[in-house]
């Protein structure tokens, strides 16, 4: 599937999204932009099934992680216009 996983710089490095992902799409990498000195990364987006558990787990008000579903998924779910 061709989903895109975008990590925003509002990430607080809490690891909740990494732990919520059932397919290990995400991992933490070093980053100086937050107190935790790490940020989520999505090196294996080809394994993403679009469950959005990472989005649900994110504790920030900004949804620091977003999954953008591929066209084939939105069509099959009846979400395409």
Swiss-Prot record:
One of its GO terms (cellular component) is plasma membrane-derived thylakoid membrane. It is found in: Cellular thylakoid membrane. Pfam families: Fer4_7. [4Fe-4S] cluster 1 binds at residues 11, 14, 17, 58. Its main location: membrane. Residues 1-31, 39-68 form the 4Fe-4S ferredoxin-type domain. [4Fe-4S] cluster 2 binds at residues 21, 48, 51, 54. Binds 2 [4Fe-4S] clusters. Cluster 2 is most probably the spectroscopically characterized electron acceptor FA and cluster 1 is most probably FB. It catalyses: reduced [plastocyanin] + hnu + oxidized [2Fe-2S]-[ferredoxin] = oxidized [plastocyanin] + reduced [2Fe-2S]-[ferredoxin]. The keyword Thylakoid applies. It is an enzyme of class 1 (oxidoreductase). This is Photosystem I iron-sulfur center. It comes from Rippkaea orientalis (strain PCC 8801 / RF-1) (Cyanothece sp. (strain PCC 8801)). The lineage of its organism: Bacteria, Bacillati, Cyanobacteriota, Cyanophyceae, Oscillatoriophycideae.
């Amino acid at each position: 599937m061709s989903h895109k996983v975008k990590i925003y710089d509002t990430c607080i490095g809490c690891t909740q999204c990494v732990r919520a992902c059932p397919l290990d799409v995400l991992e933490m990498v070093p980053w100086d932009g937050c107190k935790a000195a790490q940020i989520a990364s999505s090196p294996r987006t080809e394994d993403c099934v679009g469950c959005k558990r990472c989005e649900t787990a994110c504790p920030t008000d900004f949804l620091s992680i977003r999954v953008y579903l591929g066209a084939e998924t939105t069509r099959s779910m009846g979400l395409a216009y």
